[in-house]
């Protein structure tokens, strides 16, 4: 019998492999993405100190009523970029969390770039 691999386990293995190569610092924090079925979350993380510097998600009150999940992701990208620039973090390391750079992840990344983040 052929067994189909679990997509989330495959993503977690891919994410662990990438996380071994990238790390965030206080000068250049890591922009981490987590995508669930309903929401998307973004965090700026300083891995050296082990602290979250800024965060945004579709659960925030600042997110206006989007027409779809891709538009909501773009709003989250803009919000995390504004919060990061306000805290003085302009250059970040992008961590897509093992997800493909497509759809909601790409929309968040492009909106973050348009609003002042460099990666």
UniProtKB/Swiss-Prot annotation:
Keyword rRNA-binding: yes
InterPro entries in the cross-refs: Ribosomal_uL18_bac-type, Ribosomal_uL18_bac/euk
Keyword Signal attributed: no
Region Disordered, annotated ranges: 1-23
GO molecular function: 5S rRNA binding; structural constituent of ribosome
Secretion signal span: none
GO cellular component, one term: cytosolic large ribosomal subunit
Domain of life: Bacteria
Positions with biased composition (Basic residues): 10-20
Function (record text): This is one of the proteins that bind and probably mediate the attachment of the 5S RNA into the large ribosomal subunit, where it forms part of the central protuberance.
The protein, known as: Large ribosomal subunit protein uL18
Organism listed in the record: Lacticaseibacillus paracasei (strain ATCC 334 / BCRC 17002 / CCUG 31169 / CIP 107868 / KCTC 3260 / NRRL B-441)
Encoding gene (name): rplR
